[in-house]
Amino acid sequence: MLTIESIETIPLRIPLPFTYKGSYYEMRNRCAIVTRVRTAEGIVGEAYNADEDEPLQSEIRAIIHDELEPLLLGQDASLVERCWQTMLPVTFDQLRPRWYAMQAIACVDTAIWDAFGKAVGQPLWRLWGGYRDRVPMIGIGGYYVPSDGSQKGNEIEDEIDFFRLEHGMVGMKFKIGAKLPQDDVARLVRARRHAGDEFLFVVDANQGYTVSEALVFLGMARAEGIELRWFEEPTRWHGDARSLRDVRMRGNVAVAAGQSEHSRVGMREMMVAGAIDVSNFDASWGGGPTEWRRVAAMASAFDVELGHHEEAHLGSHLLASVPGGTFVEAFSPDRDPIFWNLIVNRPELVDGHFPLPDRPGLGWELDEDYIEAHRADR
């Protein structure tokens, strides 16, 4: 028995040194919510999730404390599926975006799993299946340089050196989609020349292209001798799964998507439509590890590989637990100071792989001083 007594949330917000621009979005802060589920037995489940800035950060925390916590008080945290189903009704409000509630559930579900792992003395990657104890890591970069002079102009090369030389990562997810295809190809060629042929590349348009633009990009990249591990979110939202399928079939390229879905239902539609080769469903946004594992089970029936959108501290456990896992992802320290500074016992890569901890639960020790220094509620 793990009787839930209370839930604590701590919002974190760290301003970034400059604006990071993707296709149609900009990032100025790195944010997270630290969630702690306290039990009567003294075990505390702890996790951080939900990379959302204000006002959504406050909205998610309000859902946790005003709606989820009253439902869970007195419940047994070791009955994880029951806890998840107990939380599900908060998604039924049709006048509120459903993904707000799914992110709130994700925060609590992750912390509940951490508590359960601690109670049974097992790390989550092993508890969830234990397929391997380390996962290859790729970096995320290639953001567009601002025109205000705040950056030097050699950021692509510096990022690659950080990922490849300093940390031994096996590849890079490269941002495209804000420029014309030929301009993005030129940026990718520059990156490939600097990185060398053994460094793999994924491209991520963040829904920036039309189908035609995505196909032009692929043709030009191939003419330069560049092969991609996959093409992530190549097309705009209104094309739905059909556009992804068109790029996949007409472009003869592996397509990844899923981070913009917030439940297994949306992932089911993508898989049934033959739209993706790789799911990058995000457990920290979409209902937590419980929902991610449902997506993973479904993906195995469709021969779809598994990634995880960002959040290496959680994605590594999930991807290590299943046969179809691909790469865990990490930003540079400027883009994600939380990953590089919050986790006290973050391991160094071994031959390009991120080792999983043997400690129970998620196994991470969070830096209390860092949390206190970057609280957004003070």
Put a short name on every predicted segment.
Residues S6, R38-A119:
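Metal- or metallocofactor-binding catalytic centers and their adjacent structured scaffolds
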Residues D109-V145:
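Glycine-rich, aromatic-flanked loop segments that form ligand/cofactor-binding clefts
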Residues I14-K21:
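Short Pro/Gly-enriched beta-strand edge/turn motifs at strand-loop
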Residues F162-K175:
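Catalytic domains of carbohydrate-active enzymes, especially glycoside hydrolases
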Residues F174-H309:
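Catalytic core of soluble alpha/beta enzymes
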Residues I4, G42, L68, V108, ...:
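Conserved, mostly hydrophobic/aromatic
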Residues L2-E5, L12, E26, A32, ...:
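Flexible C-terminal active-site loop/helix
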Residues R98, V135-E157, I176-A178, A205-V211, ...:
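Active-site mouth loops of central-metabolism enzymes
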